[in-house]
Design a protein with these regions (language model features):
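C-terminal transmembrane helical hairpin of 12-TM major facilitator-type secondary transporters
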Residues: 71-121
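Extracytoplasmic gate region of multi-pass secondary transporters
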Residues: 2-62, 91, 114-122, 149-161
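Loop-to-transmembrane helix entry/capping segments in MFS-fold secondary transporters
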Residues: 39-43, 131-141, 174
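Multi-pass alpha-helical transporter architecture, strongest
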Residues: 88-97, 179-215
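Paired intracellular helix-loop junctions of major facilitator superfamily
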Residues: 69-71, 125-134
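Hydrophobic/aromatic positions within or immediately flanking transmembrane alpha-helices
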Residues: 43-47, 74-80, 104, 135, ...
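Residue-level signature of the transmembrane alpha-helical core
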Residues: 9, 13, 47-51, 81, ...
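A membrane-interface helix-boundary motif in multi-pass transporters
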Residues: 38-39, 75-78, 161-185
């Protein structure tokens, strides 16, 4: 009944599909890329990058969406769409570089970009839901997100790695599999563009509906 809500939900689910797959196979890929790299040092670097870049992207995305959204509500769809558009080449490129250092640099940018859609998406989830159903809205949001992204992302990437391994070595099979997995960003981008198109109408309707509910 709320097109922007469902489009947002699919947008973040497809976007997280790729990022969850990366989180599962990234370390395995880096070890295959350079087996001589100090593993303990690598794990520390990955921890710092994941903890700072992703959080930074979430904060930056929320601030940017609120700033632009105060002038045009469609920014809550545009900001995630732009960020995920940047994730696509950055993610694929990170798997085709020849050194761990360059991969970590691109991965930092990737995590920064992929964190940007969180703030706008949660804003949409809470704003568009009736005030007497916001807890259920969040629960349904996470159900769809985890069914598609957490359940599908790592599974799909793992299957593709096994498929490509029939003709390629471990390193290249992960490169081809993850490049294919990152293509799921395309429907995510489309979903957020749909959000931008239908959000003004749904946002106005939600504000009116919630005002009526609040007034009793």
């Amino acid at each position: 009944k709320i097109p922007a809500w469902w489009a947002m939900c699919l947008g973040i689910a497809f976007g997280s599909f790729a990022s969850y797959a990366l989180s599962v196979f990234h370390t395995k890929y880096l070890i295959a890329l350079d087996p001589t790299f100090d593993f303990q040092h690598l794990i520390i670097l990955l921890g710092v990058i994941n903890g700072t870049a992703y959080a930074g992207g979430a904060f930056f995305g929320a601030r940017l969406a609120d700033k632009w959204g105060s002038k045009d509500i469609r920014a809550y769809g545009w900001v995630p769409a732009i960020a995920i558009s940047l994730c696509l080449p950055t993610g694929i490129g990170s798997f085709w570089v020849s050194s761990i250092e360059v991969n970590l640099l691109l991965s930092t940018l990737f995590l920064l970009f992929v964190g940007i859609y969180l703030g706008p998406s949660f804003a949409i989830a809470q704003t568009l839901a009736p005030i007497n159903m916001r807890a259920m809205s969040t629960a349904l949001f996470f159900f769809v997100l985890n069914m598609i992204a957490l359940g599908g992302g790592p599974t799909f990437a793992g299957i593709m790695i096994d498929v490509f391994k029939e003709n390629y070595n471990d390193l290249d099979s992960m490169r081809y599999a993850m490049s294919l997995t990152f293509c799921i960003f395309v429907p995510s981008i489309i979903s957020f563009l749909v959000v931008a198109r239908v959000l003004p109408k749904d946002w106005a309707a939600a504000e009116q509906r919630n005002k009526e509910l609040a007034d009793g």
